Amino acid sequence: MNVDWSFHFEEQFERIIATIVLAQSYEDGIEWHERIGGQISLLANFPLMGDNVPARCFTQPPDDLERLRQLIISPYRVVYEIVGEQCRVLAIVRCSSMLVRNELLWDK
C-alpha cells in the first residue's frame, strides 16, 4: 500500500518540527521527525493499525466519520484514511486539540 501525505499534513508537520527545534533543540526536532515519520511509514504494511477517530474529537463530526482513522503518537494525533491501495495522511494535531472536519480533506 502507498502512504501519501496531504499538503495540509506536510505544512502542519513542518510547523510542529520547527516549533520543537526552536523550543528544545535541533536534535529533538530530528528525533520527533523520525519518530512520527517512522510510525506513519508502518501504515504501508499495517494500514488498519490505527483506531477509528471518535466523534468526540471533532468540533462537528463529518458525515463520513467512519473513513477516518488515527495514530496516536503522544502528544500528537495523526489522522488518515484508506482509499483503495492508498493510505492518505490528512492531518497531525495535538491530542488535546479538537479536529475540524474541513481540515481533513485530501488536497493533492
What are these regions (language model features)?
Residues 1-68, 108:
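Basic, Lys/Arg-enriched alpha-helical interface segments
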